[in-house]
């Protein structure tokens, strides 16, 4: 028997009807004592999990503000960091800015995150909201 390449097999499958393919799969499972259900279930779970992740992203209510870099106007960024993060002294704010990327605010609402991002970007910093 001549060995068929993957392309040859795919071409043969393309010419078959769904009913014929279904019968082929049943015979394949019986002949080799395998099941095609496990890979199909995993593949089906993938998009469902992705859809759930996308839905969770839409409903996200808590955000993290991360300082990626201070940019060229470091002093202005330090001042804004002291304003945004309560209880920071000058040295702590400077250390935080110098050690970027660092989270500045964690689990804040969208308005607070966008407000902080706007102030930091106006001061010359690079910021991401996650």
From Swiss-Prot:
Keywords: Ribonucleoprotein, Ribosomal protein. Pfam families: Ribosomal_L12, Ribosomal_L12_N. GO terms for cellular component: cytosolic large ribosomal subunit. The keyword Ribonucleoprotein applies. The keyword Metal-binding does not apply. GO terms for biological process: translation. InterPro entries: Ribosomal_bL12, Ribosomal_bL12_C, Ribosomal_bL12_C/ClpS-like, Ribosomal_bL12_oligo, Ribosomal_bL12_oligo_N_sf. GO terms for molecular function: mRNA binding; structural constituent of ribosome. Belongs to the bacterial ribosomal protein bL12 family. Forms part of the ribosomal stalk which helps the ribosome interact with GTP-bound translation factors. Is thus essential for accurate translation. Homodimer. Part of the ribosomal stalk of the 50S ribosomal subunit. Forms a multimeric L10(L12)X complex, where L10 forms an elongated spine to which 2 to 4 L12 dimers bind in a sequential fashion. Binds GTP-bound translation factors. PANTHER family: 39S RIBOSOMAL PROTEIN L12, LARGE RIBOSOMAL SUBUNIT PROTEIN BL12M. This is Large ribosomal subunit protein bL12. It comes from Mycolicibacterium vanbaalenii (strain DSM 7251 / JCM 13017 / BCRC 16820 / KCTC 9966 / NRRL B-24157 / PYR-1) (Mycobacterium vanbaalenii).
